[in-house]
Amino acid sequence: MLSTSRSRFIRNTNESGEEVTTFFDYDYGAPCHKFDVKQIGAQLLPPLYSLVFIFGFVGNMLVVLILINCKKLKCLTDIYLLNLAISDLLFLITLPLWAHSAANEWVFGNAMCKLFTGLYHIGYFGGIFFIILLTIDRYLAIVHAVFALKARTVTFGVVTSVITWLVAVFASVPGIIFTKCQKEDSVYVCGPYFPRGWNNFHTIMRNILGLVLPLLIMVICYSGILKTLLRCRNEKKRHRAVRVIFTIMIVYFLFWTPYNIVILLNTFQEFFGLSNCESTSQLDQATQVTETLGMTHCCINPIIYAFVGEKFRSLFHIALGCRIAPLQKPVCGGPGVRPGKNVKVTTQGLLDGRGKGKSIGRAPEASLQDKEGA
């Protein structure tokens, strides 16, 4: 798992539940007694991981089914949403094994250790990359609406998705190679065992891809989006769009930034002056808490990117076989859209709030008002 970084201490657990290491805190001239984080994790993590798995699996499978059965993947946005849901599912299917391992020990062997660690990393990086693509897609649809009609094609979505998966796999390779099943303190543990140089490289890479890069892209894109929306005249729709955009941006960093900061501090303990007994013990606890928080983000994605839209709720009822009123507007050039007519064609997919799209032939500023329901 991402947080199970190999400790540089030789650990022995005594009967009192404290972790005694050969590390000496020279400020006090005594061995470092660390509270056993694993003991707490064995009680709390299995039920937490189980809840995350259940809600996340149901939510993301629902998104996948609706996108495939109802939407038919006719929008670039829907293609990215599908891949984001798949990323979360890859991430989620590893949780039952981590839950079992936290309660007992790793009993699935070295091959399964590498396989599920690979799925975990690929789902993690894939989720980040598709959030970035959704951000860029939203930027093009709102700020460069006319250009977006030509550039945001299904073919472009498929090609960029394939490239994104390849990059996610490549970013996951170090974690897969250096992860193995090994016996520690009489129990088998599945975790990464990086050489010193590789551990530093992997932590820096993870922070660049998981924190710095998405932060930079989101600030640039959403700054342009906000400037464009603030020039529009429809105040109610404008405020709704701004709220959704800020939710997308803030929630991701709210769930994953603490974890990225903690693993950076944990890897470079000596540089930050955190190599004393008390600090390392607090970092161990913070690592476990922040990773669990980050894992729950895969449950939030279906809510942020899908359930906030009225169109999605309509499609949800259709998927369940309910009889409801027809949608107000055709979706992505679907049924009801006739070539050569000045009709409305949505460019936002399931992210639409009220499903209003761009009218072909309109001036860019006029069309932007239709997109504010995102």
From Swiss-Prot:
Role noted for this protein: Key functional receptor for CCL2 but can also bind CCL7, and CCL12. Also transduces signaling mediated by CCL13. Its binding with CCL2 on monocytes and macrophages mediates chemotaxis and migration induction through the activation of the PI3K cascade, the small G protein Rac and lamellipodium protrusion. Also acts as a receptor for the beta-defensin DEFB106A/DEFB106B. Regulates the expression of T-cell inflammatory cytokines and T-cell differentiation, promoting the differentiation of T-cells into T-helper 17 cells (Th17) during inflammation.
Covalent S-S links between cysteines: 113-190
GO cellular component: cytoplasm; dendrite; external side of plasma membrane; fibrillar center; membrane; neuronal cell body; perikaryon; perinuclear region of cytoplasm
Membrane topology label: Multi-pass membrane protein
Membrane topology (Extracellular): 1-42, 101-114, 179-206, 269-285
Modified residues (Phosphotyrosine): 139
Transmembrane stretches, start-end: 43-70, 81-100, 115-136, 154-178, 207-226, 244-268, 286-309
Modification after translation, per record: N-glycosylated. Sulfation increases the affinity for both monomeric and dimeric CCL2 with stronger binding to the monomeric form. Binding of sulfated CCR2 to CCL2 promotes conversion of CCL2 from dimer to monomer.
Residues bearing attached sugar chains per UniProt: 14
Primary location recorded for the protein, binned into one broad class: membrane
UniProt-annotated location(s): Cell membrane
Resulting phenotype, residue 296 to N: In PCLUD; likely pathogenic; loss of CCL2 or CCL13 cytokine-mediated signaling pathway; loss of expression at the cell surface; contrary to wild-type, does not rescue CCL2 cytokine-mediated calcium mobilization and cell migration, when transfected in CCR2-null monocytic THP-1 cells
The entry's keywords: Cell membrane, Disease variant, Disulfide bond, G-protein coupled receptor, Glycoprotein, Host-virus interaction, Inflammatory response, Membrane, Phosphoprotein, Receptor, Sulfation, Transducer, Transmembrane, Transmembrane helix
Any GO MF annotation of the entry: chemokine (C-C motif) ligand 12 binding
Positions of the UniProt region annotated as Disordered: 348-374
The protein's name: C-C chemokine receptor type 2
Effect on the protein of changing residue 355 to D: No effect on expression at the cell surface, nor on CCL2 or CCL13 cytokine-mediated signaling pathway
Tissues where the protein occurs: Expressed by monocytes and IL2-activated NK cells. Abundantly expressed on CD14+/CD16- monocytes and weakly on CD14+/CD16+ monocytes, type 2 dendritic cells (DCs) and plasmacytoid DCs (at protein level).
Family matches, as InterPro entries: CCR1-9-like, Chemokine_CCR2, Chemokine_rcpt, GPCR_Rhodpsn, GPCR_Rhodpsn_7TM
Cytoplasmic side: 71-80, 137-153, 227-243, 310-374
Expression induction or repression: Up-regulated by CREB3. In NK cells, induced by IL2.
Any GO BP: monocyte extravasation
